[in-house]
Swiss-Prot record:
Keywords of this entry: Chloroplast, Membrane, Photosynthesis, Photosystem II, Plastid, Thylakoid, Transmembrane, Transmembrane helix
InterPro entries reported for this sequence: PSII_PsbT, PSII_PsbT_sf
Protein name stated in the entry: Photosystem II reaction center protein T
BP GO annotations: photosynthesis
Record family assignment: Belongs to the PsbT family.
Cytoplasm among keywords: no
Role: Found at the monomer-monomer interface of the photosystem II (PS II) dimer, plays a role in assembly and dimerization of PSII. PSII is a light-driven water plastoquinone oxidoreductase, using light energy to abstract electrons from H(2)O, generating a proton gradient subsequently used for ATP formation.
Subunit structure: PSII is composed of 1 copy each of membrane proteins PsbA, PsbB, PsbC, PsbD, PsbE, PsbF, PsbH, PsbI, PsbJ, PsbK, PsbL, PsbM, PsbT, PsbY, PsbZ, Psb30/Ycf12, at least 3 peripheral proteins of the oxygen-evolving complex and a large number of cofactors. It forms dimeric complexes.
Amino acid sequence: MEALVYTFLLVSTLGILFFSIFFREPPKVPTQK
């Protein structure tokens, strides 16, 4: 159980960092709709 909790915390931290950088610096790739 502890390994699962640590993995969840690690993934959540990486996700928050990724989203913060992604929304702060939007990609320069033009979106095709």
